[in-house]
């Protein structure tokens, strides 16, 4: 009988452990709409804005693969009231009539893995809105404060990084670029925080020089 009880106990522990997915930090990634439309084979149906808007909030790991499509702990669907704000800060750049599909995909693939910091679907989107608006992690505004405007000029990597550092407790961001012809455009900027989502950290895993998304030291168009 004791052996049966022990077996049941171990089985419960294994089930609980297998349903808990670990992560080390969050990536809060924003994409520059104009560059996304310029560098992608998929045509944007709507004219892009000269703004960085949300791509996603992703639980990530320092080592090994990032978690994806995790079991959902608590079900609380996204409130319609939030969608008015999401339409502004988190549009589907390629087709704004498909915003809901984009949000659903980001929640299912990434947000579902943020437990316990992210408690449910509604909390995931509330957290992103808070980070972008209340916590002033709007990359466009951070750059603008440093007099770096989206005027199509070519910038030095260090100038962009330093501007972002000034708005992120001097922590290093992750930049993604895309080369089109002879022009390299700034496509995404990622801010990283600890697993609580409360404190900035240096972003690990920068793109290597052999990557098509590597940002050179100079002549980055923004």
Swiss-Prot record:
Which N-terminal residues, if any, form the signal peptide? 1-22
One annotated Gene Ontology cellular component of this protein:
extracellular region
- Glycosylation sites noted in the Swiss-Prot or TrEMBL record: 40, 138
Disulfide bonds listed in the record: 37-44, 70-113, 177-215, 192-203
Q: What is its EC number?
A: 4.6.1.19
Function, please? Self-incompatibility (SI) is the inherited ability of a flowering plant to prevent self-fertilization by discriminating between self and non-self pollen during pollination. In many species, self-incompatibility is controlled by the single, multiallelic locus S.
Query: Mind telling me what this protein is named?
Result: Ribonuclease S-3
Q: Which organism is it from?
A: Pyrus pyrifolia
């Amino acid at each position: 009988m004791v052996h049966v009880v022990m077996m049941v106990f171990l089985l419960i522990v294994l089930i609980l452990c297998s349903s808990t997915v670990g992560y080390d930090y969050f990536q809060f990634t924003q994409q520059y709409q104009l560059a996304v439309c310029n560098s992608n084979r998929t045509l944007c149906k709507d004219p892009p804005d000269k703004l960085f808007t949300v791509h996603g909030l992703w639980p990530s790991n320092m080592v090994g693969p990032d978690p994806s499509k995790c079991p959902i702990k608590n079900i609380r669907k996204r409130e319609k009231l939030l969608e008015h704000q999401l339409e502004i800060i988190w549009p589907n750049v390629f087709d704004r009539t498909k915003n809901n599909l984009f949000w659903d995909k980001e929640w299912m693939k990434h947000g579902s893995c943020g437990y316990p910091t992210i408690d449910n679907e509604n909390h995931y989107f509330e957290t992103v809105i808070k980070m972008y608006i209340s916590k002033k992690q709007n990359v466009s505004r951070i750059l603008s404060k440093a007099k770096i405007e989206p005027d199509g000029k070519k910038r030095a990597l260090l100038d962009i990084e330093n501007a972002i550092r000034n708005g992120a407790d001097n922590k290093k961001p992750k930049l993604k670029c895309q080369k089109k012809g002879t022009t390299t455009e700034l496509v995404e900027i990622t801010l990283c925080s600890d697993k609580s989502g409360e404190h900035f950290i240096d972003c690990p895993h920068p793109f290597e020089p052999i990557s098509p998304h590597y940002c050179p030291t100079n002549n980055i168009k923004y």
